[in-house]
Amino acid sequence: TLSSSSAASDVYKRQDFDPFWQYLEDNKIPFMLHIGPGTKTQPSKFRNNGRERAADLHGGGENLRFPDFMCLWYAPQEFLTAMVYDGVFQRFPDLRGGVIESGAGWVPEFLRMLDHGWYSFNKTDQYLKDMDLMPSEYIKRAVRFTPFPNEDVGHMIRDSAPELYLFSSDYPHPEGTKDPYGKFEASLEGFDEEVKDMFYRTNYDHMMFRKSEALAEAAE
C-alpha cells in the first residue's frame, strides 16, 4: 500500500524508482492506494472558522469528518495523473493497482478530464505526444476502484466502463452500511450477469493478477 500524498508522488514518478515498478510487474503484485496518512484532508486554515469542531464519524476525535470526506479523492487523482503523465503506466504496461476506500463517483469525470487535458496540450507537450494510449486508457488498463455502497455504481459504469469498479464492503467499518450487497444490487439493476460478475469477481481477479474462471464454473 502506497501513500498517495503529493510528496510521495514526486518520488514514485521518477525513473530512478522504476526498479520498484519493475519488481511489482515481474512478481504480479498490485499497488494499492488507501485512505490513511497520505490522504488529503481539508487544509487546517479552512477550519479556522470560529466554530467548535464536530465529532468525527465514529464519535471520537481523530477520524473522518464531512469536510475531509469531500477531499478524499484529491490525493488519488494527483497520484494517478503523475503516473500517467510521467510515463509509468506506459513503461510498465502490465502494472496493476487499486484505489481503495476513496469512493469512485469521481472516476468518470476524472477520466474525461485526463483526455480533455491531452487534447488541449498534446500539440505543445512532447510527453503527451509520446503516449501510446489516451490517458484514460492507461487507467482503464491498470487501475480498479472501490465505490462506497451508497454510491450509484450503475451510473458510474454507464458513464465510463464496467472494468473499472469492484465490490467492497469495508467490513466491519460502519461506512460499509448494514447491507452493502443489497445497495449495490439495486444500483446494478438492468445490467446483465456478465457486468455484475465483473463487479463482484473478475475485476478483482484482474487487479490481483488472478485468472478468472468462467462464470458458470465459478458458480459451481
Short names for language-model regions:
Residues 86-87, 95, 106, 124, ...:
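Mid-to-C-terminal alpha-helical segments outside catalytic/metal-binding sites
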Residues 1-8, 12:
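Single conserved hydrophobic/aromatic residue that forms the stacking wall/gate
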Residues 19-26, 87, 186:
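Alpha-helical scaffolding segments of alpha/beta enzyme cores, especially the outer helices
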Residues 39-71, 117-139:
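Active-site gating loops and adjacent loop-to-helix segments of metal-dependent hydrolytic enzymes
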Residues 27-29, 93-96, 135-143, 163-165:
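Short, well-ordered coil/turn segments that N-cap beta-strands
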Residues 57, 70, 74-78, 108:
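C-terminal active-site-proximal or functional interface alpha/beta core segments in diverse enzymes
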Residues 9, 29, 34-38, 102-105, ...:
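Active-site beta-loop-alpha junctions enriched in small/polar residues
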Residues 13-19:
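Charged helix-capping and loop-helix junction motifs
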